[in-house]
Design a protein with these regions (language model features):
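Short, Lys/Arg-rich N-terminal segment immediately upstream of the first membrane anchor
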Residues: 1-6
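Short, structural beta-strand-to-alpha-helix junction motif
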Residues: 56-61, 74, 88-98, 103
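Non-cytosolic head/periplasmic domains of membrane-anchored proteins
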Residues: 91-171
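Hydrophobic membrane-insertion alpha-helices, especially the h-region
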Residues: 7-25
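Sec-exported extracytoplasmic/periplasmic mature domains
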Residues: 65-69, 79, 83, 98, ...
Length: 171
């Protein structure tokens, strides 16, 4: 049996668009980011969102939807004073704290969220800098282990008021 170019073209198109249609019908075809962090799969925290999966593209509102941390708490912890905290993107923190000389960004938010919610977070071989305002909130909450407190004491820095991001926060 020989296959000419016309039937082959039809077969290719049917396979391509049929596959897309089938995937879409089954709910597997997703073309947008869902902003949902992965969850712990085993142990005491199974089924809960994992703060280690927070990405720079997440907003404080996205974090609030996945974790029990209000956007206003995150804004207070990281010195965000302008605009709606729910729309503030985590990746804007690095630009805000750039002049301080400290790398305060996504990793800092991950650590803050983990400690604030009591979820596990591995800091082995990491030096995650936290602003004093964030550490003060965590210490006031009072659910930290002695090891977590020691880590925060070692990596907490006092920074001046951060420079607002170049793009204003959408209101």
């Amino acid at each position: 049996m020989t296959l000419t170019s016309k039937p082959l073209a039809v077969i290719v198109l049917v396979m391509l668009f049929g596959g897309i249609f089938f995937s879409s019908a089954m709910g597997w075809w997703v073309t947008e980011s869902t902003k949902e962090p992965v969850t712990f799969t085993e142990g005491e925290f199974a089924g809960q969102a994992n703060p280690a999966d927070i990405r720079g593209s997440y907003t404080f509102g996205d974090i609030a939807n996945s974790f029990e941390v209000a956007p206003e708490v995150l804004a207070q912890a990281f010195g965000i004073t302008e605009g709606d905290p729910s729309g503030f993107a985590v990746n804007e923190l690095e630009a805000m704290y750039l002049e301080s000389g400290y790398e305060i960004g996504t990793a800092s938010v991950r650590l803050f969220v983990a400690h604030y919610t009591g979820l596990p977070f591995d800091t082995t071989d990491q030096e995650i800098i936290m602003p004093k305002s964030a550490t003060d909130i965590l210490l006031a909450k009072g659910n930290l282990s002695p090891e977590q407190i020691a880590y925060l004491e070692k990596y907490t820095v006092i920074v001046d008021t951060p420079v607002p991001a170049e793009q204003p926060v959408a209101e």
